[in-house]
């Protein structure tokens, strides 16, 4: 049986250190279970642009 990996995209907003999604470049925090996530990268960037988060947001892609 072939394994299928699911890619999820999360928006990390620079909020001065509050609710970070990354502990390090390779380690996620417990806040991922509450984070807004997208399955489509285009929709992720569209959400960022629509809500004016261009300068303070970063997209994190996570393979599950």
Predicted regions, residues:
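Intrinsically disordered, low-complexity boundary segments flanking structured domains
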Residues: 1, 23-25, 43-47
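Short intrinsically disordered terminal tails
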Residues: 1-6, 61-64
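Short aromatic-glycine-(Arg/Gly/Cys) micro-motifs in beta-strand/loop hairpins
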Residues: 3-32
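A short, exposed loop/beta-hairpin motif centered on an aromatic-Gly-Thr core
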Residues: 25-42, 60
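Short, mixed-charge low-complexity intrinsically disordered segments
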Residues: 41-64
């Amino acid at each position: 049986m072939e394994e299928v990996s699911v890619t999820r995209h999360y928006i990390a907003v620079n909020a001065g250190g509050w609710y970070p999604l990354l502990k390090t470049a390779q380690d996620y925090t417990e806040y991922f279970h509450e984070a807004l996530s997208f399955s489509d990268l285009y929709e992720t960037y569209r959400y960022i642009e629509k809500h004016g988060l261009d300068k303070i947001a970063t997209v994190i892609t996570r393979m599950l």
